């Protein structure tokens, strides 16, 4: 199919030509030139690396919103964890290797949805700013780590959250 097929210039440190088409999407990843650090020499160079695509990011956020966590204020946190952990584990296994900061932003977005759930569930949080609720979630993550992304080290920020 000619609409889908395109030739892309794989820009790197060794090839410095300028072309209009240097990125492409494949299997939910966007391949594009980016700064990379060599493992042994610790030198920075331009490499062609995969990142999670904007299309995939949009779909994942839509899926997270479709869970309607805020309206499930009657549901305990461990039941929510049982519901979403297999999905979070799958996303982390697929996108986590090359997702980088864009995947971390998705996990922070999920933490923000959990904070909105807590605000709806507990009356004491209704007048508090979001960072107080995120600190509470961070304390739960330190104690229990019931969500998969908490278990692998992406715990809620105990301060302000940037999206």
What annotation goes with each model-predicted range?
Residues 1-163:
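Non-catalytic terminal/accessory segments
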């Amino acid at each position: 199919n000619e609409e889908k097929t395109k030739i892309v210039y794989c820009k790197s440190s060794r090839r410095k030509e300028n072309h209009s088409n240097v990125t492409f999407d494949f299997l939910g990843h966007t391949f594009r030139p980016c700064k990379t650090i060599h493992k042994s020499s610790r030198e920075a160079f331009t490499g062609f690396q995969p990142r999670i695509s904007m299309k995939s990011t949009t779909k994942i956020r839509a899926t997270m919103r479709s869970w309607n966590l805020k309206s499930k204020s009657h549901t305990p946190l461990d039941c929510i964890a049982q519901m979403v952990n297999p999905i979070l584990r799958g996303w982390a296994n697929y996108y986590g290797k090359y997702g980088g900061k864009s995947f971390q932003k998705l996990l922070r977005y999920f933490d923000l949805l959990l904070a909105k759930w807590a605000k709806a569930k507990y009356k004491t949080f209704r007048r508090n700013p979001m960072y107080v609720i995120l600190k509470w979630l961070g304390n739960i993550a330190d104690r229990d780590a019931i969500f998969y992304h908490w278990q692998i080290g992406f715990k809620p920020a105990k301060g302000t959250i940037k999206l």
